């Protein structure tokens, strides 16, 4: 799975960038020819991590560029799968629930402020990528937040439970519901 361009944000402690550069269609043909990748994650405005923009601002993906890149790739190989890295949709209700649980568990305003500042990619933007031909949408940050919100809530409501399997069922159910919702929405 190749990534062409620079994707801003923080994927992990070793993979960070303050800026993004869009994938250049003129460089794409050479990249695909040189690498032979069959899965491509172009940079079109998505970002790694939970902060995909400023609070109150919507993320705007370059759907026109996505179509152009797919056209270039299809001239070389119709079997190349397009992937969206950093495409988490961060639902306000999940964030609000997590903030409530953090307030219950910790009294730190910094924790809740950080969660309240998270900005994701709106589903209509993701749907535009799917309609353009993207086949794989990476939503790791969204999955982590769904998992953590469910886990914090379960711990806060069941303080005497020490069996990890109890919590596994709750977090697995939360993730499953999130995945089902995505399938319904696509």
Q: Predicted segment positions?
A:
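Metallocofactor- and cofactor-centric catalytic cores in central/energy metabolism, strongly enriched
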Residues: 112, 116-119, 126-127, 135-136, ...
